[in-house]
Every structure is written in structure tokens, then in C-alpha cells.
A protein has these predicted regions:
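Active-site-proximal beta-strand elements of phosphoester/diester hydrolases
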Residues: 2-7, 17, 27-30, 109-117, ...
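Short acidic-hydrophobic surface loop/beta-edge motif
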Residues: 6, 18, 100-105, 125
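Active-site HxH/HxHxD metal-binding segment of metal-dependent hydrolases
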Residues: 11-12, 23-26, 31-114, 128-130, ...
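Divalent metal-coordination and catalytic microenvironments
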Residues: 18, 30, 56, 68, ...
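Active-site metal-binding loops of divalent metal-dependent hydrolases
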Residues: 31-32, 57, 83-84, 118-119, ...
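Histidine-centered catalytic micro-motifs
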Residues: 52-62, 114-122, 186-194
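Divalent-metal (often Zn2+) His-rich catalytic cores of metallo-beta-lactamase-fold enzymes
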Residues: 132-139, 149, 161-261
Length: 266
């Protein structure tokens, strides 16, 4: 298996290139708009990118899924969450994914888990490697649902949605991933410095077991107290977040070109 984490300082963005070296198939998770590094690394490793995945509709940076697909002459399938309903449907995507769906990338199996809370449509990908053990999960791409030392903030869609999303986040943390074993590694979409969480740790990966033991997000308490602790002292979100989320929902224009099929923001 080939695994590469690409980390962009400043906004502290983490994206991933994962591939099966025997079959040459690969997948990119949550790409940024600067797509050349993914293409260069894939070429160096003799990989061809089969899927481009988004864990959710990002609010802090322009997602590079369309840019990457275009640079690959359309030879990659863009997969997004199908749990967003009419408000958060991404019309440019080739495929919508739902809870329990699986993607095959050579010997690698990526299973979809719907983990709402940071956003309504948020999904995570649990990865198994059949060349090692087809029954045991190895790691998980958690997007902005679960960070090192933190969880994704539930207040980015405004006051009307904040409490609903916070309740969903509680269920995602204590129910949806409860059966995953402690040894599962987590690879989030952000590190320390991102405003997509309140107190994200400085490491760029962890394990579920470690987070369950030390993270404030996993401390057992009542639902009401957990949500109260989550929301207190939450920093203000940047003013561009809501606009950016809509751009990523509709599909950002390709760099240096015009895309008439995309709903452009005023």
C-alpha cells in the first residue's frame, strides 16, 4: 500500500493519496485546489487515480476535486456524500455515497460511515486492506468530524442549525464509531491552526484508542453537558466560511477557465 499525507500550513489542511501498488489504482481524499502534487506523486509511484473523494462540503478552502478531475482529463470519479438533502447536494459529482457503501481500490476497501454533526452530510471512510486482513479495519479518514484532540465545530451553518448539529455530533462520536476498535488510526482533514475545530492538537494523526482515553470530546457525560462544553468558548468563524461552503457545494470554477454549468455566487 502507498500512503501519502499532504499537509498545507496556514489553514492546516491535510489531504491524502492512497494507492495499491500492485494494481496501480489510487484514491485522493479531500484534495486542495493545487492539484499538481497529487498528479506528480501518482506518476512517480506508477499509480492512476481512480476516485476523488470528499468527506464533506468544506468551508475554509476551495476544494480541488473538479480541478483534479479536469487535470486527469476526466479519468477519475468524483464521489461525495449523498446525505446532504436538497440544500447540500453537489450537482457536479459523478457519484453520491451513502452509509455502508464500499469503494474498491485494488486490495483496499473504503467503507462509508455517515457521521453528521460538523455538517449534515459529513461522511468518513473506514479503510481495510485485503492483502493484510480483509476483516479488520486499519484506519479511517475522518475529515472534519474527528480531529486529534477535538471534534469538528457544529456552528458553521448558523444559530438555527447549531443545536441540531451538536446533537448529531454527539451521536456520531458515541454511537456511530463506537464499535470500531481502539487500534484504528485516524487521519483528519486538519491539524492545529484550523478554525474548523476549537482546540485541534498539533499531531496530524492518532488512534481511536488514544483519543478515547485523552480527548475531551470522548469524556463520558450527559448529552446536555457534552454539548454545553463543546459550544462554550467557541471562536468566531471567519466571515468567508458560509460563502466558501456554497462555492464548494455548487462546484468551483476551474482555474483559468469558465464553467457555465456551475452556479456562480454573486
Amino acid at each position: 500500500m502507498f500512503f501519502h499525507q499532504r499537509f498545507v500550513p496556514g489553514l492546516a489542511i491535510a489531504s491524502y493519496l492512497l494507492g495499491d501498488e500492485k494494481t496501480g489504482e489510487a484514491v485522493v481524499v479531500d484534495p486542495t485546489r493545487d492539484v499538481q502534487p497529487y498528479i506528480d506523486i501518482a506518476r512517480e509511484e506508477n499509480l492512476h487515480i481512480k476516485y476523488i473523494l470528499e468527506t464533506h462540503i468544506h468551508a475554509d478552502f476551495v476544494c480541488g476535486s473538479l480541478e483534479l478531475q479536469n487535470s486527469l482529463s476526466g479519468h477519475a470519479t468524483i464521489c461525495v456524500s449523498g446525505h446532504g438533502g436538497a440544500d447540500w447536494k453537489q450537482p457536479f459529482a459523478d457519484r453520491e455515497l451513502s452509509e455502508g457503501d464500499r469503494l474498491e481500490v485494488g486490495s483496499l476497501n473504503l467503507e462509508v460511515i455517515h457521521v453528521p454533526g460538523h455538517t449534515p452530510e459529513h461522511i468518513a471512510f473506514v479503510v481495510k486492506d485485503a492483502s493484510r486482513n480483509s476483516d479488520k479495519p486499519w484506519f479511517m479518514f475522518t475529515g472534519d468530524f474527528l480531529f486529534v484532540g477535538d471534534v469538528g465545530r457544529p456552528d458553521l451553518l448558523g444559530e438555527d442549525e447549531k443545536q441540531k448539529l451538536a446533537n448529531q455530533l454527539y451521536d456520531s462520536v458515541f454511537d456511530k464509531i463506537a464499535k470500531l476498535p481502539d487500534y484504528v488510526e485516524i487521519f483528519p482533514a486538519h491539524g492545529a491552526g484550523s478554525l474548523c475545530g476549537k482546540a485541534i492538537g498539533s499531531r496530524n494523526s492518532s488512534t481511536l484508542g488514544y483519543e478515547r482515553r485523552v480527548s475531551e470530546a470522548f469524556k463520558e457525560t450527559t448529552r446536555e453537558k457534552w454539548i454545553e462544553t463543546l459550544l462554550e468558548d467557541m471562536p468566531l468563524s471567519p466571515s468567508y466560511f458560509q460563502r466558501m461552503k456554497k462555492i464548494n457545494r455548487d462546484g468551483p470554477a476551474l482555474l483559468g477557465s469558465k464553467r457555465h454549468s456551475v452556479s456562480r455566487m454573486p
